[in-house]
Curated annotation (Swiss-Prot):
GO function terms (MF aspect): peptidyl-tRNA hydrolase activity; tRNA binding
GO biological process, one term: protein quality control for misfolded or incompletely synthesized proteins
Species assigned in the record: Prochlorococcus marinus (strain NATL1A)
Compartments, record wording: Cytoplasm
Name listed for the protein in its UniProt record: Peptidyl-tRNA hydrolase
Designated gene of the protein: pth
HAMAP family: Pept_tRNA_hydro_bact
Positions bound to tRNA: Y19, Y70, N72, N118
Keywords assigned by UniProt, alphabetized: Cytoplasm, Hydrolase, RNA-binding, tRNA-binding
Length: 202
């Protein structure tokens, strides 16, 4: 992995044990697995309002960030981390849940709107741009009916995955980690295509 391509991985979620393993915290879950695989531990960083962890060395060092600001203020932590560690927007990847995608699907984008996601909206506002990479992880919607979906959105995203869903999610997390570990400065499009077309039974 080349240093000019990836320096900071941000997982979005809400802090606190009451939110652990909820659908909205799937970004946290990916980072926790990356940390476990690389034997690194998260530590509190008050100056950037988040928990950080780093792995690798030299030009291959990558930092992980889980904001402690709650989802709607995630951008505050991301901007502080970017400025403190002197990263550029193109060295950042945000991992986020997406209710518009079914469980088992991944969507990678190099830029774009928030899609109604408050965490992404906050990051866009604090960075002053929507031009940063984001990796959206499908969590499915509570209903196909728009009115019912709207009324159940909060309970759905703050709910936990079933045992069956966790099996699918684990495949997704491992595929994401495999791709992140192989990112270089000239294969982002290839990685994006691989993730966008991934199916858990591949």
């Amino acid at each position: 992995m080349l240093s000019d391509e990836l320096k900071l991985l941000v997982g979005l979620g809400n802090p606190g044990t009451e939110y652990e393993k909820t659908r909205h915290n799937v970004g946290f879950m990916v980072l926790e697995e990356i940390a476990r695989k690389n034997n690194c531990s998260f530590r509190e960083s008050k100056k950037i309002f988040g928990r950080t962890c780093e792995y690798g060395s030299g030009i291959e060092k990558t930092r992980l960030l889980m904001p402690n600001t709650y989802m709607n203020e995630s951008g505050k932590s991301v901007r502080l981390a970017k400025d403190w560690f002197n990263f550029q927007n193109n060295q950042l990847i945000v991992l986020v849940d997406d209710m518009d995608l079914p469980l088992g699907k991944i969507r990678v984008r190099s830029k774009g709107s928030s899609g109604g996601h408050n965490g992404l909206k906050s990051i866009i506002n604090h960075l002053g741009t929507a031009e940063f990479k984001r990796l959206k992880i499908g969590i499915g919607a509570p209903s196909n009916d728009q009115q019912e979906r709207k009324s159940k959105t909060v309970s759905h995203v703050l709910g936990r995955f079933s045992k069956e869903e966790f099996i699918i999610l684990n495949f997704i997390i491992q595929e994401i980690i495999s791709c992140i570990e192989s990112i270089t400065s000239n294969n982002w499009e290839k990685i994006s295509t691989r993730l966008n077309s991934y199916k858990p039974d591949n």
